[in-house]
């Protein structure tokens, strides 16, 4: 996204991608209304929605057999009043294809960033490993978009603030039938929580487990794992037998952390490279998109004039740190409360507080705004009249209320110049 936006502004951009393609399973597959609004502002929405996807207009959960609607996106002040469920590789292929229409955009596949190039104390490029050897790519600015294990932030010795997370997630696929609920997302029972994301022909499923307990679970055997899934979601029935090997089940070690400082002279980190998020709410990819929009808005002109100082890079962190901190604080709190579910291995009943919270009129709209729009959603520079932006800012005050409501509910149960981005 950032490569597209900078190339669109006239900046020469080289994107380095480690792999030969974008195909990776169990990556973030949710495209939230805030991101879809960015696509609209860029004039890409119609083409984007032609890609295969599912639309999630409401979010429903089941707690111990009690079904409740947790969020309703149908009233959001956006052009798309839903979350689009789409494989991330399709999203990346789409953006890459559109970005290639700009003469200044260059994506180099199978280029893995392994080191940073320094000139007189300033980062001036990237050393990449390629199928034919190493390659040095010079740049006026290196932007690390290479995720939570980013080589850019490691080599630059950027200090990381870690937040303890008591859960991990086991991702797997299980087939889906036409009789399965379309809008159901979360299932809580028997001391476990199971997320089911509708991918049309199958569910992308995630079982939340105590952090570090995966090996213990493996030792108990695959049949025990299948039994757990059956207990939480009985309607899956014999489909759990599709899980025949532990290789079908992928462990995500959940992290929540952020950089104390996102930049060095010649380097900026954004997205997961600057702040690793948990999968809760599927907000990670969308927070990264918001980072990209803010970065392009703030740095396109300085890149064109060649005036990208540390103070200019600091503007990006100043703009995006507040949404990051708020979102992470809420995720940490939510996970700590959700971890309490593990303390009750038997059949569970929905607490009255859960029923009371989601019985309050309008709560589902507020949680939808919190999840779908987030804190301080970004807009393409010049895309909206200032009056609309002001109105949107006023409306966004409700986000805090919505997030708080969601957390309460949970507690109850990154002249032409050159830039280089790594991903």
Predicted regions and their residues:
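Glycine-rich FAD pyrophosphate-binding loop
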Residues: 5-27
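Generic enzyme active-site microenvironment
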Residues: 15-16, 144, 270
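Active-site-adjacent segment of FAD-dependent monooxygenases/related oxidoreductases
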Residues: 32-100, 117-120
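A conserved beta-strand/loop element that lines the FAD pocket in flavoprotein oxidoreductases
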Residues: 100-114
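Conserved FAD-binding catalytic core of PHBH/FMO-like flavoproteins
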Residues: 114, 121-136, 141-254, 258-263
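Glycine-rich phosphate/pyrophosphate-binding beta-alpha loops
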Residues: 193, 254-259, 274-286, 322, ...
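FAD-binding beta-loop-beta segment adjacent to the flavin cofactor pocket
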Residues: 252-269, 325-326, 343
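C-terminal helical "tail/cap" subdomain of flavin- and related membrane-associated enzymes
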Residues: 297-423
């Amino acid at each position: 996204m950032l490569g597209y936006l900078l190339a669109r502004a006239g900046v020469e951009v080289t994107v380095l991608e480690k792999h030969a393609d974008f195909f990776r399973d169990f990556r973030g597959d949710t495209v939230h209304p805030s991101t879809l609004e960015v696509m609209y502002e860029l004039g890409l929405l119609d083409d984007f929605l032609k890609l295969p996807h599912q639309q999630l207009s409401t979010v429903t959960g089941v707690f111990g057999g009690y079904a409740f609607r947790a969020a309703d996106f149908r009233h959001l002040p956006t052009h798309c009043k839903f979350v689009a469920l789409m494989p991330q590789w399709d999203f990346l292929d789409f953006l890459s294809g559109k970005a290639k229409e700009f003469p200044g955009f260059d994506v180099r596949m199978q280029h893995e960033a392994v080191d940073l190039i320094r000139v007189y104390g300033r980062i001036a490029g990237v050393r990449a490993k390629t199928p034919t050897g190493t390659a040095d790519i010079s740049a006026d600015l290196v932007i690390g978009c290479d995720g939570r294990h980013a080589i850019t932030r490691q080599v630059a010795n950027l200090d990381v603030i870690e937040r303890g997370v008591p859960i991990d997630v086991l991702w797997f696929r299980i087939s889906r039938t036409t009789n399965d609920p379309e809008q159901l997302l979360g299932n809580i029972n028997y001391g476990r929580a199971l997320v089911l994301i509708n991918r049309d022909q199958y569910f992308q499923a995630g079982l939340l487990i105590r952090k570090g307990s995966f090996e213990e679970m493996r030792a108990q055997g695959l049949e025990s794992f299948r039994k757990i899934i059956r207990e939480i979601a009985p309607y899956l029935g014999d489909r759990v037998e599709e899980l025949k090997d532990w290789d079908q089940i992928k462990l995500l070690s959940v992290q929540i952390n952020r950089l104390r400082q996102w930049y060095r002279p010649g380097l900026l980190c954004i997205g997961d490279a600057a702040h690793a998020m948990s999968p809760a709410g599927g907000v990670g990819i969308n927070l990264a998109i918001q980072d990209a929009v803010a970065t392009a808005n703030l740095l396109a002109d300085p890149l064109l004039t060649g005036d990208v100082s540390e103070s200019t890079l600091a503007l990006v962190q100043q703009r995006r740190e507040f949404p990051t901190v708020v979102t992470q604080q809420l995720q940490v709190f939510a996970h700590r409360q959700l971890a309490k579910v593990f303390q009750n291995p038997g059949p569970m009943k929905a607490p009255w507080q859960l029923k009371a919270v989601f019985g309050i009129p309008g709560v589902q709209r507020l949680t939808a705004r919190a999840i779908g729009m987030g804190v301080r959603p970004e807009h393409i520079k010049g895309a909206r009249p200032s009056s609309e932006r002001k109105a949107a800012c006023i409306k966004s005050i409700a986000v805090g209320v919505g997030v708080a409501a969601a957390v309460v509910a949970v507690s109850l149960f990154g002249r032409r110049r050159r830039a280089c981005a790594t991903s």
